[in-house]
Amino acid sequence: MNPIVSAASVVASGLSVGLAAIGPGIGQGTAAAQAVEGIARQPEAEGRIRGTLLLSLAFMESLTIYGLVVALALLFANPFTS
């Protein structure tokens, strides 16, 4: 295996996990803060807010999992090596 391709794959896999976690991390923090604020304003709507929050957190977390899958593909099933 070419050492340059191997090194680039390791760097790219690290970047894919890191960059894929930044956006969802910020989004999850914002969503949780807004959910807590909404529950504080309308305690009777807590069930609907919590359900919507959990669904949206799952969608946001899937983006991070996609980044992990790309990183694992670059590390173990690298299409750029022969």
Swiss-Prot record:
Q: How does it sit in the membrane?
A: Multi-pass membrane protein
A GO cellular component annotation here is: proton-transporting two-sector ATPase complex, proton-transporting domain
Compartments annotated for it: namely: Plastid, Chloroplast thylakoid membrane
Q: Which CDD domains match?
A: ATP-synt_Fo_c_ATPH
Keyword line = ATP synthesis, CF(0), Chloroplast, Hydrogen ion transport, Ion transport, Lipid-binding, Membrane, Plastid, Thylakoid, Transmembrane, Transmembrane helix, Transport
- Give one GO term, molecular function aspect: lipid binding
**What other note does the entry give for this protein?**
In plastids the F-type ATPase is also known as CF(1)CF(0).
Q: What does this protein do?
A: F(1)F(0) ATP synthase produces ATP from ADP in the presence of a proton or sodium gradient. F-type ATPases consist of two structural domains, F(1) containing the extramembraneous catalytic core and F(0) containing the membrane proton channel, linked together by a central stalk and a peripheral stalk. During catalysis, ATP synthesis in the catalytic domain of F(1) is coupled via a rotary mechanism of the central stalk subunits to proton translocation.
Give the NCBIfam families listed for this entry.
ATP_synt_c, PRK07354.1
Family label: Belongs to the ATPase C chain family.
The name of this protein is: ATP synthase subunit c, chloroplastic
Q: What is the lineage of its organism?
A: Eukaryota, Cryptophyceae, Pyrenomonadales, Geminigeraceae, Guillardia
